[in-house]
Amino acid sequence: MANTNYINRDETVFNDAQSLMQLNKNILLKGPTGSGKTKLAETLSETMNRPMHQINCSVDLDAESLLGFKTIQTNENGSQEIVFIDGPVIKAMKEGHILYIDEINMAKPETLPILNGVLDYRRKLTNPFTGEVVNAAPGFNVIAAINVGYIGTLPMNEALKNRFVVIQVDYIDGDILSDVIKQQSQLSDDIMIQKIIKFNEDLRTMTKQGQISEEAASIRALIDLSDLATIMPIERAIQRTIIDKLEDEREQQAILNAVELNF
């Protein structure tokens, strides 16, 4: 049965993150794509019993995506009026919830300074669309995630980075990875799980050597292929979850070679 528990051999990763939240510090989770950063944020949200509002950054991210937007609604009297619909930042601030900013280094640098007051000691924001001054309610926390060396990422502004405390989140392996597969996928065959772990080790080696992209060795992909391995041959599961996502034929062939070696 799948669950949302975050597992890491280094227990200080989760414990430190929880302590930083209790100190009201902004947390920047730094690590390769698919290493479990979002899973860590979700587990912190569950553990602290605090809902999480997520922003998925891209070059198209704008102030409305962060703060909200104006729209026309019909009120109780049947007449129309302009109202402002709060976005994830303002919702999290008003409710004292967690704000999770995923892939923060995918956003254009000029988009994020609007959050400066939210991220420093003021914990305050003046909504440029309404003029409303929003003060963060007790319990409000900010967690951001940054993918290191991923295609499309931009250098993170130093002034922005200085508003966070950084926690490195690396890939998991060995018996810890085995536990994750058992807990978060439908696969229970120990022999197959060990083969998948060895296969993943080979993928990570190729990632470090620059032969394949990081996404191919991600925990997400591993969980997906483990699920599919319960209903189809492992070779086809890998084809569906990893190989077919890649555009580069050399990367595809490198993974096919690893499949032949491990299965």
Swiss-Prot record:
Alphabetized UniProt keyword annotations: ATP-binding, Nucleotide-binding
Covalent S-S links between cysteines: none
Entries under SUPFAM superfamilies matching the protein: P-loop containing nucleoside triphosphate hydrolases
SMART domains in UniProt: AAA (SM00382)
InterPro entries in UniProt: AAA+_ATPase, ATPase_dyneun-rel_AAA, CbbQ/NirQ/NorQ/GpvN, CbbQ_C, ClpA/B, P-loop_NTPase
Residue numbers binding ATP: 31-38
Any one GO molecular-function label of the UniProt entry: ATP binding
Record-given protein name: Uncharacterized protein SSP1341
